[in-house]
A protein has these predicted regions:
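Rossmann-like NAD(P)(H) cofactor-binding subdomain of soluble oxidoreductases
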Residues: 64-152, 170
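Nucleotidyltransferase catalytic core that binds NTPs
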Residues: 344-457
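Short acidic low-complexity segments
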Residues: 59-74, 348-355
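NAD(P)-dependent Rossmann-like dehydrogenase/reductase catalytic/cofactor-binding core
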Residues: 204-208, 233-243, 247, 251-344
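NAD(P)+-binding Rossmann beta1-loop-alpha1 motif at the extreme N-terminus of oxidoreductases
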Residues: 1-56, 62-65, 92
Length: 457
């Protein structure tokens, strides 16, 4: 890719405009799209954005209402629309997006109906025509307020892609003296943090609205990242992501800044304003939008998330903000540090990733009635293909085999195909399987999701 990159930005909100200016400053050719002709006309004429005081949009940043103009022939296509508009935007832009396109998503959220992250939604929508199997998706996330980026205040962010070379390409495009960009291959972890931290930030805001101080704020932030981590490890994310910019970094800035709509909304709720009215006053509150998906994920993966659960109860009107604080403070006593089996099993994958490996979710299928030396060797080699290994167990009388498999350090999850209500392809989508490892002679399952790669050992 040349130093001067052509970039199309889908979305003309504060983040899209702030990034358009930053990318133009880096010497790139930038075109911004909005579905509103009136907004495009105003941006083109005034070269200002009311929500970003002091920002002047360069004359050579182009504006358009035409999807073909913004999407065709671009080196990078950036999705900067709200999370609820990602699927519709991807569907509309699909005819103009070539296969192999680098797509960067900056929206944060989980789609409630499918429990997909934003890059997964984009891939799912683009793949429906069977002609977009090789798009390169990047999640760009971290502690980034558009208001500060627009004023060239120092900021750091994460470029996450399963292909490190693509992550580094995006890193180079965004990096400058005011924007330091890091890379990560744990895309799911980065996106999960971006969605879940909004809920935890709501809790911090509610606490502040109740008049609580810094002690409570610090406790909620710390325990908030702990419960996000518990969920992420169950989903196969890398543990270190939660202690990084996309995890604790983004949570801190969202939970403490008045730039944050989640924090401001929480403060209003804590002060007694009904949740619906608080949202009306503040605008889009992604933390409230993320609650239905968070509750489903918590139940599906059997993870304790007391803060998120309490926020959900307040938003639904089941308890008051004051009762939420009391309920959290009077929970049964527990230890701060619990040695999770998943954390132990993740250790080898973590070390490999730090040394340059790539984190992927891997699945094997079989009866594994006899855990012979050969079977264990096969499972170990399968785990080496990615880092997080799921065994899909076939046959009957699986309880003993399931326990034996989980006792192995190389196995992270065991699914009982006889009792699961979902089909194998549905389970692969649910658990975001990226690599299916087969032994010689095993047939490839029917209706394999297009995102799953097959590897024979």
């Amino acid at each position: 890719m040349n130093n001067r990159t052509t970039i199309g930005i889908l979305g003309s909100g504060t983040w899209g405009i702030a990034l358009a200016r930053l990318l133009h400053r880096n010497g790139h050719d930038v075109t911004v799209w909005s579905r509103s002709p009136k907004k495009i006309e105003n941006l083109s004429a005034t070269r200002t954005y009311p929500a970003l005081p002091g920002l002047v949009i360069p004359e050579t940043v182009h504006f358009t209402c035409d999807l073909q103009t913004v999407a065709s022939g671009k080196d990078i296509l950036l999705f900067a629309v709200p999370s609820i508009a990602i699927r519709q935007t991807a569907e509309s832009a699909r005819p103009f997006i070539p296969d192999g396109q680098i797509i960067v998503d900056v929206a944060k959220g989980i789609e409630p109906d499918t429990l997909m992250t934003m890059t997964e939604v984009i891939r799912d929508e683009l793949s429906k025509d069977g002609q977009h199997d090789h798009v390169k998706l990047v999640a760009l996330s971290g502690p980034t307020h558009a208001e500060e980026v627009a004023l060239d205040m120092p900021t750091s962010i994460v470029s996450a892609c399963t292909d490190m070379q693509v992550a580094e390409t995006v890193q180079d495009v965004f990096m400058n003296t005011c924007m330091r960009t890091y890379t990560n291959t744990d895309v799911l972890g980065v996106e999960l943090c971006g969605a879940m931290k909004n809920i935890e930030a709501l809790a911090v805001g509610i606490s502040s609205g109740l008049g609580n101080g810094d002690n409570a704020r610090a406790a909620l932030i710390t325990r908030g990242i702990a419960e996000i981590s518990r969920l992420g490890l169950k989903m196969g994310c890398a543990e270190y992501t939660f202690g990084g910019l996309a995890g604790i970094g983004d949570l801190i800035v969202t939970a403490t800044s008045m730039h944050s709509r989640n924090n401001r909304c929480g403060i209003l709720i804590g002060q007694g304003v009904p949740p619906q009215e608080a949202v009306r006053q503040v605008g889009t509150v992604e933390g409230i939008n993320a609650l239905p998906a968070a509750m489903q994920l918590m139940e599906r993966y059997q993870v304790e998330m007391p803060i998120a659960k309490a926020v959900n109860a307040v938003v639904k009107g089941e308890i008051s903000a004051k009762d939420m604080a009391l309920a959290l403070m009077t929970r049964d006593k527990t230890s701060e540090v619990r040695q999770s089996e998943l954390a132990v099993r993740f250790e080898s994958a973590l070390m490999r990733h730090i040394s340059g490996g790539i984190m992927r979710r891997v699945m094997v299928i079989g009866e594994f009635a006899d855990l012979s030396h050969e079977a264990i060797a096969f499972l170990t080699r399968a785990k080496d293909e990615g880092g997080h290994l799921t065994v899909a167990l076939t046959g009957c009388a699986q309880d003993v085999r399931k326990s034996s498999l989980l006792a192995l350090r190389c196995v992270d999850r065991v699914l009982d195909l006889e009792t699961e209500k979902l089909t194998l392809p549905e389970l692969m989508r649910l658990y975001r399987i990226e690599v299916l490892v087969l032994a010689e002679g095993q047939d490839v399952p029917e209706m394999l999701p297009p995102t799953v790669k097959v590897k024979y050992l």
